[in-house]
Amino acid sequence: TEQAYLKTYQLGKKEEDWLAVKAKAGDNTRDGQQSEVLFIEQDYLFLKEGGMLAIVLPDGILTNSSMQYVRTQLEDWFRIVAVVSMPQTAFAANGAGVKSSVLFLKKWPKDHTEELESKKKSIEAKLLKDSDYIAKRDLWDREIRQKQKEKVNSLKSHDLKSATAIKKTQAYKEWNAELLAEYAAKIDDLKSKLTDSYLVRKQKELPDYPIFMAIAEE
């Protein structure tokens, strides 16, 4: 089956979210994963350490925020030697009109890849500790439950006595939606700040190297 096939690929599975309070249970397969993404991993497995690779990738993989996990894996597996942006019409003769780039990659030694992954995990752990992220999330969860309990008590009447019945009323539903939206915004803001801090720390602490960039003319 497709799921069994995808599970054989690292890029066929969802990556662990370092800002998740609890690990998600159940299947972590990326259903319908793009073949060009899996092709990157297949190339990595075929190459020897220090081996070179030229690969054509849709620009969406290089720019879309939803594809950040692919770019992260690329930088862990390969030294990016060069990126050449191709014209929109480069592969039109083959029926492909997607804007693409050619990446020239060199496979890192295994110990270098492991070192990069370890440093990233270390940065994540320090940011979580310094920001009291888990404690803040736990506190906010407790605040939500307490406010929900207080709201239920305030809505109790002769006709509405049970918490279950009160939570089904339109008044409670509208109030609760506003409450959850308020805390969701606080969580998103904290996550955004930590993500920005992670990128700054990663840029400072991980080894840097030049990448040749070019735009191919039609």
Language-model regions: role of each:
Residues T1-E218:
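A conserved structural/catalytic subdomain of Rossmann-like adenosyl-cofactor enzymes
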